[in-house]
Amino acid sequence: MMLFGCRRSLWCALSFLGAAAGYRVGSAYLGTSVLQNQTPFELRNSKVVTQCTMKVELIPALTDNYMYLLIDEESKEAAIVDPVQPQKVVDAVKKHGVKLTTVLTTHHHWDHAGGNEKLVKMVSGLKVYGGDSRIGALTQKVSHLTTFQVGSLHVKCLYTPCHTSGHICYYVTKPNSTEPPAVFTGDTLFVAGCGKFFEGTPEEMYAALIEVLGRLPPETRVYCGHEYTINNLKFARHVEPCNDAIKQKLAWAKETYNSGEPTIPSTLAEEFTFNPFMRVREKSVQEHAGERDPISTMGAIRKEKDHFKVPKD
């Protein structure tokens, strides 16, 4: 979400300016004191997803954001995705005993890129990647299919404009590994949803979701920018009330979130079963939208979602 016009803009500004000496990560406090103005979301548990070749720590930030610490287990080199709260990043890096070398910025909005300039002052020598000159502290501007390494991990940049005109998703693999790849999707693809079309069109979001992300291996794990899963699934249920995959995922998401755990990651295979924006080619979604083609359907359901009143149940 953008800082301007953002319903939490005041909180965003205050949380960034306030010096954070300590944070809760898992069940332990880090640092010397606790930030008085932390949101309930920030106090939720972090989550570590471990594979034999890479480790991803989901770090809650602000009111519903996630930062992701990506660790190459072989070299102990690390990258951070969208480090809006730099002190929390530094604390996580120290906890894991790794070397932070890289910042992966999905887009320029404050709640994703707003910590870059502070972080590069806290950690020297960082390479800051992104696809938009509006990104703070940018050192490496990338484009579609740009590749680079984080230790032994291979990172491929995927250009997915629409939410913003310079949005990049980061697809991470380990050569010769049998483990699932990971993709960090920022505000393009959410669990059961997609980002608002602030600087783009239905055609662009269709291309991003179906023709770019949708062609990645189905087992790819999706790490998105926000904890919007429950509300997204309630809209998905509204679009397809008879879809059992949506009902099952919503029940799971409620239970998982209420237990203090993130509902992320999902997989691309899952998204095609319950995400209406990934299902715009399905007859049931087109009939709900009153459209006959997937791109018109994409535009119609995004417009409807923008004004959707989320039910309590």
Swiss-Prot record:
Which reaction is catalysed here? an S-(2-hydroxyacyl)glutathione + H2O = a 2-hydroxy carboxylate + glutathione + H(+); (R)-S-lactoylglutathione + H2O = (R)-lactate + glutathione + H(+)
Q: Which GO terms describe its molecular function?
A: hydroxyacylglutathione hydrolase activity; metal ion binding
Which amino acid positions bind substrate, per UniProt?
A: K196, F197, F198, H226, E227, Y228, R302, K303, E304, K305
The record's comment on cofactor binding reads: Binds 2 Zn(2+) ions per subunit.
Keyword Nucleus listed? The answer is no
Q: Which GO terms describe its cellular component?
A: mitochondrial matrix
Record Pfam families? HAGH_C, Lactamase_B
User: What SUPFAM superfamilies does UniProt report for this protein, alphabetically?
Assistant: Metallo-hydrolase/oxidoreductase (SSF56281)
For this UniProt record, give its keywords in alphabetical order, as a comma-separated list. Cytoplasm, Hydrolase, Metal-binding, Mitochondrion, Transit peptide, Zinc
Region Disordered, residue ranges: 285-313
Q: Give the SMART domains listed for this entry.
A: Lactamase_B
Query: Which EC number(s) does UniProt give?
Result: 3.1.2.6
Looking at the record's lineage, which domain of life comes first? Eukaryota
Residues where Zn(2+) 1 binds: H107, H109, H163, D187
Where composition is biased (Basic and acidic residues), the residues are 285-294, 301-313
Q: Which GO terms describe its biological process?
A: methylglyoxal catabolic process to D-lactate via S-lactoyl-glutathione
Q: Summarize the protein's role.
A: Thiolesterase that catalyzes the hydrolysis of S-D-lactoyl-glutathione to form glutathione and D-lactic acid.
Q: Which NCBIfam families match?
A: GSH_gloB (TIGR03413)
Which family is annotated?
A: Belongs to the metallo-beta-lactamase superfamily. Glyoxalase II family.
Name of the protein this chain belongs to:
Hydroxyacylglutathione hydrolase, mitochondrial
Organism classification:
Eukaryota, Metazoa, Chordata, Craniata, Vertebrata
